[in-house]
C-alpha cells in the first residue's frame, strides 16, 4: 500500500517541478526584455555615442539633456520659470517658457512640476548615422538638379518649402574657401560660443538644417550650446514635435516666448540664457561651411571689442542652390540707411596683407554676427525699443565704431544664407524697419539725420507723427564716451559723406505710355543689369532712383550705380567722376517728360520685345513711351 501511494504522488511532484522550471524561464525572459532603467539608459547612450554624427567631436557637452519643459495645453500662454532674472527692459513675463533641463536636475524638476506643464521624455536615438548627401544626388528620396529647378508653390515667407522638405537635413556644401584658409589651424584655447537662432513660424526643414549644419561643422570644444528661441510660432509642427526633436540633440536648448518679441528682442532673450564666452546670432535659415566658427572666435580672442561676421553666401530661395560670393566685399549703407554689399575699393584691397586678411567693414551684416558676450551686454546689447527686425545691424555697427570697437568680415569664415523673396515682407515688417531707422537717425546720426530725412521722406513724415524716445540710448552714448557720426564719415566710410544738395528728382520713375516703372530685376550682382519696366511697387528698393544736380540717374540701393548706355541699351554701371565714361552717364530730364541722353542726343524709350520691356535710346519723337515722370517728394527744408 505504501509503495503504491509513493508511485501515485510521483507524477504530482514531476508536474510541480516542471511548473517551477517554466516560471523561472518566464522570469528570465522578462528580465532580459525589460532591464532596469539605469542599465537601459547606459546602453542607449552608448549606442548613441557610437553612431551619432557628433561623436567625432573632441569634447563632450556633459550629461545629455533628456527633458524639455513644455506647456500641457499648447493653446494657453506660457508662464515664466523661476530663478531667471530679467534683462534690460524685458519683463519676466516676456521671457521664458521652455528650456532643456540637464539630467542632473531631472528629479528636482519632476518634483516641482505644476499642473500646466509636462515633461517630455527623450526618445531613443537612431542607431544609424544619417548619411551626409551632396548636391544633385540621384539616389532614392534625394533631389536631383533637374528636380530642384521644378517650380513649387511659395509659403507666406516666399520660400519653396515643399522643395526644401525634400532636401536632406545634412548635406555637404561645395568647398569655396580660399586655399590659404585650409592651411590655417585654430588654436586649442579659443573661447566658447553660444549660437542663438531665433525663429517665428520658420520652415521645419530650414530650421533643422541650420541646427545640424552647426553641429556638423563646429568642434564641441568650441561650441558651448545652440539656443533656439521660438518667437511665438503658431505652426503646430514647431510645438511638441520640435520639443521632442530638440530633446534628442545634445547641447541644444529650446526657449519659447509667450509674446511676440520680434527678431531683435528674441535675440536679446537668447543672450540672457547664453553661457558661452562669445555670442553668435544667426538667422534660422543658414548653412555653414566647416571651419566657419574658428576664425570668428580667434579674432574676438585677440580683441574683445571686435564685432565680426563671416562672408555671407547666397542660397537661392527658389532652388536652394548655393552661390558663393566671388569677390571680396564689405558691408556699407546709403543715406536711406539701407544695407548692401560693395566690392572692396582699390585702396582697401591694396592695404590687405593677403586675400584672407580680415576686412574692415563700415557695417556688419545682420544674418550672422558674433561678439564677446560681456562686451555685448556692457555696451547696451540691442536697442530694446526697436520693433520686430530691421536696422539692428546698423545700430550695432555704429555703436561698435563710435564707442571704441571695430567691425570686420573674415574671408575664411563662410556661411550660406537664404535671402527670402522681398515681396513676401509684410507691411508690418516694412513699417517696423522704417520706425527702427528713425530711431537710429535720432540716436546716432546727429546733425546728419537731416541728410537721412532728405533721402527718406516717408521717414521724415513718421518722425513728425511720432517722435521716438531715445533718451536711454543717448545716455548710453555719454556713459561709453562715444564719438560723433562725423568721425564715422571721416575715418570709417568717407565715401558716404554728402557731397551735393538734395537731388532734383527722386522716387520711382514712371513710364507714361505703359504705366510701369523702371526696375532692375537681376538677382545677386547687379552690375551691368539692364533696366526694364515692371509693375510699380513702393516696397522695391530697386525702383528708387535719383536724378542729381550732376545730371546722373543714381540707382536707389546701392547708390554707387548709375544709368549708363551699352549698345543703346540702358544698363547700370559704377558711377564715374572722371574720364570718357562719365559722359555716358549724363541725362537731361526735360519739362515735357522726356529724358535725353546728353552724349547721343537720343531719348530713353520703353521698347516692348516679346515678353520683355527694356529701356533703349531712340530718336526723340515725343511718343508716350518716351514720356517719364518721377514721384513727387515733399519738401523737408522747413524742418
Curated annotation (Swiss-Prot):
The GO biological-process annotations, alphabetized, read as:
O-glycan processing; protein O-linked glycosylation
Q: Which residues cross the membrane?
A: 12-34
UniProt note on tissues of expression: Widely expressed. Highly expressed in small intestine, placenta, spleen, cerebral cortex and ovary. Expressed at intermediate level in uterus, mammary gland, stomach, cerebellum and whole brain. Weakly expressed in fetal brain, bone marrow, thyroid gland, thymus, heart, skeletal muscle, lung, liver, colon, pancreas, kidney and testis. Not expressed in leukocyte. Expressed in both normal and osteoarthritic cartilage. Expressed at low level in chondrocytes in all zones of both normal and osteoarthritic cartilage.
Compositional bias per record (Basic and acidic residues), positions renumbered to this chain: 124-136
This protein's GO cellular component annotations are: Golgi apparatus; Golgi membrane; transport vesicle
What are the UniProt keywords, alphabetically?
Disulfide bond, Glycoprotein, Glycosyltransferase, Golgi apparatus, Lectin, Manganese, Membrane, Metal-binding, Signal-anchor, Transferase, Transmembrane, Transmembrane helix
Q: What is its EC number?
A: 2.4.1.41
Q: Where is this region: Disordered?
A: 106-155
Q: Which residues are glycosylated?
A: 107, 574
| Disulfide linkage | 181-412, 403-482, 517-536, 562-575, 603-620
Which EC main class describes this enzyme?
transferase
Main localisation, per the record? Golgi
What membrane topology term does the record carry? Single-pass type II membrane protein
- What does the UniProt record say this protein does? Catalyzes the initial reaction in O-linked oligosaccharide biosynthesis, the transfer of an N-acetyl-D-galactosamine residue to a serine or threonine residue on the protein receptor. Although it displays a much weaker activity toward all substrates tested compared to GALNT2, it is able to transfer up to seven GalNAc residues to the Muc5AC peptide, suggesting that it can fill vicinal Thr/Ser residues in cooperation with other GALNT proteins. Prefers Muc1a as substrate.
Domain statement: There are two conserved domains in the glycosyltransferase region: the N-terminal domain (domain A, also called GT1 motif), which is probably involved in manganese coordination and substrate binding and the C-terminal domain (domain B, also called Gal/GalNAc-T motif), which is probably involved in catalytic reaction and UDP-Gal binding.
Name this polypeptide is given: Polypeptide N-acetylgalactosaminyltransferase 15
Give the organism the record lists.
Homo sapiens (Human)
Upper lineage ranks? Eukaryota, Metazoa, Chordata, Craniata, Vertebrata
> Which gene codes for it?
GALNT15
Amino acid at each position: 500500500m505504501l509503495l503504491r501511494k509513493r508511485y501515485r504522488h510521483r507524477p504530482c511532484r514531476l508536474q510541480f517541478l516542471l511548473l517551477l522550471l517554466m516560471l523561472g524561464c518566464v522570469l528570465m525572459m522578462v528580465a532580459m526584455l525589460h532591464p532596469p532603467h539605469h542599465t537601459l539608459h547606459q546602453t542607449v547612450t552608448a549606442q548613441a555615442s557610437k553612431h551619432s554624427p557628433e561623436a567625432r567631436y573632441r569634447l563632450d557637452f556633459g550629461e545629455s539633456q533628456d527633458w524639455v519643459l513644455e506647456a500641457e495645453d499648447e493653446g494657453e500662454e506660457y508662464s515664466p520659470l523661476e530663478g531667471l532674472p530679467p534683462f534690460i527692459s524685458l519683463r519676466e513675463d516676456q521671457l521664458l517658457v521652455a528650456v532643456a533641463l540637464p539630467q542632473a536636475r531631472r528629479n528636482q524638476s519632476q518634483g516641482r512640476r505644476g499642473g500646466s506643464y509636462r515633461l517630455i521624455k527623450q526618445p531613443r536615438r537612431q542607431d544609424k548615422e544619417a548619411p551626409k548627401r551632396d548636391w544633385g544626388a540621384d539616389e532614392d528620396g534625394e533631389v536631383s538638379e533637374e528636380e530642384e529647378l521644378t517650380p513649387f508653390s511659395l509659403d507666406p515667407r516666399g520660400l519653396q518649402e515643399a522643395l526644401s522638405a525634400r532636401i536632406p537635413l545634412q548635406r555637404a556644401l561645395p568647398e569655396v574657401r580660399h586655399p590659404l584658409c585650409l592651411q590655417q589651424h585654430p588654436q586649442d584655447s579659443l573661447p566658447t560660443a553660444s549660437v542663438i537662432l531665433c525663429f517665428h513660424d520658420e520652415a521645419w526643414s530650414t530650421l533643422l538644417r541650420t541646427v545640424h549644419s552647426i553641429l556638423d561643422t563646429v568642434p564641441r570644444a568650441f561650441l558651448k550650446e545652440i539656443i533656439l528661441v521660438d518667437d511665438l510660432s503658431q505652426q503646430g509642427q514647431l510645438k511638441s514635435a520640435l520639443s521632442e526633436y530638440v530633446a534628442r540633440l545634445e547641447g541644444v536648448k529650446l526657449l519659447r516666448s509667450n509674446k511676440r518679441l520680434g527678431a531683435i528682442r528674441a535675440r536679446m532673450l537668447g543672450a540672457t540664457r547664453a553661457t558661452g564666452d562669445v555670442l553668435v546670432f544667426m538667422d534660422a535659415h543658414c548653412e555653414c561651411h566647416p571651419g566657419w566658427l574658428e576664425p570668428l572666435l580667434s579674432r574676438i580672442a585677440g580683441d574683445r571689442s571686435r564685432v565680426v561676421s563671416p562672408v555671407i553666401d547666397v542660397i537661392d530661395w527658389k532652388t536652394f542652390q548655393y552661390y558663393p560670393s566671388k569677390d571680396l566685399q564689405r558691408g556699407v549703407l546709403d543715406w536711406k540707411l539701407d544695407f548692401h554689399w560693395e566690392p572692396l575699393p582699390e585702396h582697401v584691397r591694396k592695404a590687405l596683407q593677403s586675400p584672407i586678411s580680415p576686412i574692415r567693414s563700415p557695417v556688419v551684416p545682420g544674418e550672422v554676427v558674433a561678439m564677446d558676450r560681456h562686451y555685448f551686454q556692457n555696451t547696451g546689447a540691442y536697442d530694446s525699443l526697436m520693433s520686430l527686425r530691421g536696422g539692428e545691424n546698423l545700430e550695432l555697427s555704429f555703436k561698435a565704431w563710435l564707442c571704441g570697437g571695430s567691425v570686420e568680415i573674415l574671408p575664411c569664415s563662410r556661411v550660406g544664407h537664404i535671402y527670402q523673396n522681398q515681396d513676401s515682407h509684410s507691411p508690418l515688417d516694412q513699417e517696423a524697419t522704417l520706425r527702427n531707422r528713425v530711431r537710429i537717425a535720432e540716436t546716432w546720426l546727429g546733425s546728419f539725420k537731416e541728410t537721412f530725412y532728405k533721402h527718406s521722406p516717408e521717414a521724415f513724415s513718421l518722425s513728425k507723427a511720432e517722435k521716438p524716445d531715445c533718451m536711454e540710448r543717448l545716455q548710453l552714448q555719454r556713459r561709453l564716451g562715444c564719438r560723433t557720426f562725423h568721425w564715422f564719415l571721416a575715418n570709417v566710410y568717407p565715401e558716404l559723406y554728402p557731397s551735393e544738395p538734395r537731388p532734383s528728382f527722386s522716387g520711382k520713375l514712371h513710364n507714361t505710355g505703359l504705366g510701369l516703372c523702371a526696375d532692375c530685376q537681376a538677382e545677386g550682382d547687379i552690375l551691368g543689369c539692364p533696366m526694364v519696366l515692371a509693375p510699380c511697387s513702393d516696397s522695391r528698393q530697386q525702383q528708387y532712383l535719383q536724378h542729381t544736380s550732376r545730371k546722373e540717374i543714381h540707382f536707389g540701393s546701392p547708390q554707387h550705380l548709375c544709368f549708363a548706355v551699352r549698345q543703346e541699351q540702358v544698363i547700370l554701371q559704377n558711377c564715374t567722376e572722371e574720364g570718357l565714361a562719365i559722359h555716358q552717364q549724363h541725362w537731361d530730364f526735360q519739362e515735357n517728360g522726356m529724358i535725353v541722353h546728353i552724349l547721343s542726343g537720343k531719348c530713353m524709350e520703353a521698347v516692348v520685345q516679346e515678353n520683355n520691356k527694356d529701356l533703349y535710346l531712340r530718336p526723340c519723337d515725343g511718343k508716350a513711351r518716351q514720356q517719364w515722370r518721377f514721384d513727387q517728394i515733399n519738401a523737408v527744408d522747413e524742418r
